[in-house]
C-alpha cells in the first residue's frame, strides 16, 4: 500500500486508513460488534497488508478501542513510530459539567486520557469530533495550539463539521491571525451517494490545503452491492438494525448509482467496495474503512490495487 501526503502537511499516511469505531461497540441488540480478539486480528490484517494509518476516538467502545490499540502495540513487534494514529475528542467521557465539548478543561483532560489508553506520549492527529457552539472558537483553538506546542498532538483536524464550511474557515482564520496551529485535516461523510460536501465544503478544503479523510466511504455497506431493489431490507442486516439506514439509502436515485458501480466493478473484475473506494482515492482523499471480519477488510484494502480509467471515473461521478 502506498503512502500519500495528507493535504498540504508533511505527514504521510497509508492511502487507505483503518477505522476502529466498531471496536467494543454494542449494536441495538446489545451484541458487541468487534471484541478484543477480533480487533487484534483486524489490526494484524491491516498492518500485514501494509496499512499504517489507524483511526479511533475516545468514545469508541467507551474507550475500549483506544485501550485495545495500545495493548495491540504492546504485544506486537510493529514499531509505533511507523504508524500514524488519529483520535478524536468532544463527546462525554465522564459525568460532570466539564465532561464534554471543546472547553480547555475537557480538551486537556481528554488528551491525557487518550494517551494513557493508547500507551503513548503523543497522538499524530487529533480531530475535534463535533463543533462546539458553547465554547468560544478562540478558546479551543488556543488550547489545541498548546497541545501541539507541548508535543502531545502533532496535527489537528475536524470531524463531522460538514456541510458547514464556514465553521472550519472561521477557526482557521482565527488561527492564522493569532499564529495558532490550524486545522489541516477534515473527516466528513463522503461517498458516491453521500455528497453533501460537494461545493463549498470541498472548495474550502482546497483553499486551506486541508486533507480529506472520508468516513463511511461505503455508505454503511450500501455500496458493497449486497442490497438490491427487489430484496428490500434483509432481516438481520445492518439496514434492518438501523432506524434510518433504509430511508437514507434505499432510494431509486441511489440504486441508479449502484447500477453504474456494479457495471464498472464487473468491467474491472473487482469488488464494488474496492471500486467505490478507488473513486474516492482518485480525488486525492484518504478513505477510512471499517470491518467486522478480516475478509471484509481484505476486500476494502484491495482498492489500493484498483485503477479507474478516465471514462469509468467520469461515469461514476456523473451517476453520483
Whereabouts are the PLM-identified features?
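A short acidic, helix-capping loop that chelates divalent metal ions and anchors anionic groups
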Residues: 24-29, 92-98, 223, 296-299
Amino acid at each position: 500500500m502506498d503512502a500519500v501526503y495528507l493535504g498540504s502537511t508533511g505527514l504521510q499516511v497509508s492511502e487507505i486508513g483503518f477505522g476502529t469505531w466498531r471496536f467494543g461497540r454494542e449494536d441495538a441488540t446489545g451484541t458487541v460488534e468487534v471484541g478484543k480478539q477480533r480487533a487484534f486480528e483486524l489490526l494484524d490484517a491491516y498492518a500485514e497488508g501494509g496499512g499504517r494509518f489507524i483511526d479511533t476516538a475516545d468514545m469508541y467502545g467507551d474507550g475500549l478501542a483506544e485501550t485495545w490499540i495500545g495493548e495491540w502495540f504492546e504485544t506486537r513487534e510493529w514499531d509505533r513510530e511507523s504508524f500514524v494514529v488519529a483520535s478524536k475528542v468532544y463527546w462525554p467521557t465522564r459525568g460532570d459539567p466539564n465532561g464534554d465539548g471543546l472547553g480547555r478543561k475537557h480538551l486537556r483532560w481528554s488528551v491525557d486520557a487518550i494517551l494513557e489508553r493508547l500507551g503513548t506520549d503523543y497522538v499524530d492527529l487529533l480531530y475535534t469530533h463535533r463543533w462546539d457552539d458553547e465554547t468560544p472558537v478562540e478558546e479551543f483553538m488556543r488550547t489545541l495550539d498548546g497541545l501541539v506546542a507541548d508535543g502531545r498532538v502533532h496535527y489537528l483536524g475536524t470531524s463531522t463539521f460538514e456541510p458547514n464550511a464556514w465553521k472550519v474557515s472561521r477557526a482557521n482564520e482565527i488561527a492564522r491571525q493569532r499564529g495558532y496551529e490550524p486545522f489541516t485535516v477534515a473527516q466528513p461523510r463522503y461517498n458516491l451517494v453521500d455528497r453533501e460536501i460537494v461545493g463549498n465544503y470541498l472548495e474550502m478544503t482546497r483553499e486551506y490545503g486541508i486533507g480529506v479523510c472520508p468516513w463511511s466511504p461505503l455508505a454503511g455497506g450500501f455500496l458493497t452491492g449486497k442490497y438490491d431493489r427487489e430484496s428490500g431490507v434483509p432481516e438481520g442486516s445492518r439496514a434492518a438494525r438501523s432506524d434510518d439506514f433504509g430511508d437514507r439509502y434505499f432510494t431509486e436515485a441511489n440504486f441508479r448509482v449502484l447500477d453504474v458501480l456494479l457495471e464498472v466493478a464487473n468491467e474491472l473484475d473487482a469488488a464494488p467496495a474496492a471500486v467505490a473506494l478507488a473513486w474516492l482515492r482518485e480525488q486525492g482523499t484518504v478513505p477510512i474503512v471499517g470491518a467486522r471480519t478480516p475478509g471484509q477488510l481484505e476486500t476494502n484494502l484491495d482498492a489500493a490495487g484498483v485503477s479507474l480509467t478516465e471514462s469509468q471515473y467520469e461515469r461514476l461521478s456523473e451517476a453520483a
